[in-house]
Amino acid sequence: VMGGAQLAGVISIVGRAAAEARGQAFDAEADAGMRAMIEGQIEALSRDDGVTAFGFASPDIQKTFRTPEQFMRMVRSSFKPVYRPRSYSFEAPLLVEGPPTQPVRFIGPDGRGVVALYKMERQDDGSWRIGGVTLHPTGERGI
């Protein structure tokens, strides 16, 4: 029986191989670019800097929420572990189908663990933006 971390590792390896076969090799530069976007948004959220946090979102997300204020209301109400994490750590990016996905483990303000799956979108200028985030409880409890 495979644990969650082992399964994630297998998915990551298979995903990377599939991406390379499609000519979309996932390189260290892309990995660093995605992490920089996510860390930038987490830091902006920690300062309640809605304008900066909103700037890391993809154009489609920006169209959906229209203003930094509306975006921040959504984050505060639905993404508390991301908005006020006790801690977070990056896992290996996943490339299976669709856009690259960056898993990030969070311990939320209530001490509960979640994995946030960040769907990343490459922009015309080569930069990355966050195209969506889903939260998945892990059952972990932080100190």
Name the predicted role of every residue range.
Residues 1-8:
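Bacterial N-terminal signal peptides that target proteins for export
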Residues 9-11, 92-143:
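Exposed beta-sheet edge and beta->alpha loop/turn motif
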Residues 18, 71, 110-114:
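Aromatic-enriched hydrophobic runs in primary sequence
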Residues 25-26, 32-36, 40, 50-97:
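Short solvent-exposed beta->alpha transition segments
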Residues 9-47:
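Short, low-complexity N-terminal intrinsically disordered segments enriched in polar/charged residues
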